[in-house]
Amino acid sequence: MGKMNTAERVSREMSDNFVFQRSLLAYHAAAQRIGGDVLEIGTGAGYGIEVVAPHARSFITVDKFAPAAELTRHPHVEFHQAVVPPLAFAANSFDFVISFQVIEHIKQDVELVREVKRVLKPGGKFIVTTPQCTDVAHPQPMARTGIYGGTAAKPAGA
């Protein structure tokens, strides 16, 4: 069996199958809703590209790491390596912005949301997911309390 990866960089290895399947579900749900010009923030291993990109007129991805060589072979997909925020795109550029299991790792999360709003076309949509930090199935125990510095796990007013 392969090594157990964290949800930080999901792989298709058998030992990581639950996390992979759970993460892939977001891409399938988004694929039913998106169209036009799409930006993905936090492409990671890129497993969602083959699900979502065929539904987009243009598909641009941004990740802090360079894409794996096999990902760059996808036609009609443009890769950008950058730390966000900011987003290096013109205002009103995208019909949809998607970002799955990423925002909890962005220190300037409020600024990122402002940037997403800026690059979305009028009427555009931001589809975002973040893990439930009390999820006992999360493969990295520290992440259950480390997401958003543990504040997400605390009840309001605690």
Short names for language-model regions:
Residues 86, 104, 135:
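Active-site micro-motifs of SAM-dependent methyltransferase domains
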Residues 110-125:
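A short glycine-rich, Lys/Arg-flanked "PGG" loop and its adjoining helix->strand segment in the class I
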Residues 1-90, 96-100, 110-113, 146:
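Conserved N-terminal segment of class I S-adenosyl-L-methionine
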Residues 127-152:
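Conserved class I S-adenosyl-L-methionine
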Residues 105-109:
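Di-metal (Zn2+ and/or Mg2+/Mn2+) metal-binding site signature of metallo-dependent hydrolases
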Residues 156-158:
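A SAM-dependent methyltransferase catalytic signature shared across enzymes that methylate proteins
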Residues 100-103, 129:
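Residues lining the SAM
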Residues 102, 120, 148-149:
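Transmembrane helix irregularities
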